[in-house]
């Protein structure tokens, strides 16, 4: 509200009503000890999304995706797609008790895993950076506990909560960017937060708006049914999304590919 409206409310109704509108105390303390918000969008400069089925897009559809109506990422994810070989999740956690609460563990709990997706691949290459990662989860491990980010081999990384904890007072917020990876398979998972709330330890679960999060390892180019390139790889062709024959790129790994896609 504007300052003029606030002043009018103060003049008309007095200090008590003014305070109830403009200086509301934090919400009720019932419910879980940590509020976890998954509504923040991650910054994706580039990505790989694989579909379980082969998608044969017409030129008109590619033109629509190239103009961002809809975004190719959203279009593919809405059709059962999964990012690979990692997916990033941004969460905002907030303390919801009069006393400080402490997050002492986060685990990616796998619900089901199987062979990596092979229907279609959308490969959007990027020349930019990424958001700073808070924690890493290796979904190829027997248990996918939060690890310190950094390094090439997730199995060699330190457990995040062996040296850290996240303490939150009432209303205090912290943003977490979590990366879940797989080099071997497709997995669906949820996140389990372990929180110390006074004398109790509470488990809080986070999913993707009622569905599990998804991630898939990447296959070689020639193992996909159809292939689409976007991002900086198509700038020389005028930008946007282009369709290419997966067999033309042989057994190269999409993640490490650095060649041209042709115009």
Predicted regions and their residues:
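Short acidic, flexible loop segments centered on an aromatic residue
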Residues: 104-113, 150-154, 193-197
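Short, hydrophobic/aromatic beta-strand segments
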Residues: 99-107, 117-120, 147-149, 188-190
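Ser/Thr/Pro-rich, low-complexity mucin-like regions
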Residues: 179-202
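Membrane-aqueous junction of the first/signal-anchor transmembrane helix
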Residues: 1-65
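Long, charge-dense
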Residues: 112-154
